[in-house]
Amino acid sequence: MASSADKILLGKVALITGGSRGIGRAIAAAYARAGARVFICGRNSTDVENALREIRACGGEIDGVAGDISRAQDVQRIVAAALEHFGAIDVLVNNASVLGPREAIAEYPLDAWEEVIRINLTGLFLITHEVLPAMLARRSGSIINVTSGVGRAGKAKWGAYAVSKAGLEGFTQLLAEEVESAGIRVNAVNPAATRTQMRARAYPAEDPMTLPMPDEVVPIFVHLASDASHEITGQSLNARDWLGKII
């Protein structure tokens, strides 16, 4: 684990959705190294347990549960468990998402469309809506929404995923304006191409060795969770701008 001088998130509690794999898991590990107490959720209980075991083995203070953020009852249970375990939520990272089919709109299946929007956009609303009362009561917090380049400029055959990320960008801006006076920051971060399972599904012919690892894109997430970012809100940022920075 990091030395005490490096623990810029000491005293913070972070809830990370989709925290059991890929970028979410890397953020969870980085936050734990930086001194935060971390709570993760993911749909696969085995993945959640593996992530908890790995991060605890490195000395991190972390807990988590399996759950589906597209289901209101699961969201209530996840947030209640985080608050019961750690007493507060200072940072929310909305990372959970699914890709859906890479099909043109004319051929896009309705059931797939509904699933992607339900998880990526309705899930974003549900978890944020459930966490906000705790942040508003403390008049403090940082919400970080994981976006995508296709949410900023739509691309053919990205379907519901691109639309959901465009919605996330709008959600970030309006929420930032609504809660700024309460001391809560809201920003979006685009990790860009990263060596994850989702990227491999989106680009099966791509050589993953040409891409940065999830650990390499986390510095900006640590910064936005820290008090050093207290003046940053309503922004759509790029993780690549922070590649190589020490955390």
PLM region descriptions:
Residues 13, 20-21, 44:
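Conserved glycine-rich cofactor-binding loop
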Residues 45-46, 66-78, 110:
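The beta1-alpha1 cofactor-binding region of Rossmann-like NAD(H)/NADP(H)-dependent oxidoreductases
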Residues 128, 164:
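Active-site helix of classical SDR
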Residues 133, 176-181:
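Alpha-helical segment proximal to the catalytic Tyr-Lys
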Residues 148:
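Residue(s) in the substrate-gating loop at a strand-loop-helix junction
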Residues 181, 188-189, 196, 205-247:
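C-terminal helical subdomain
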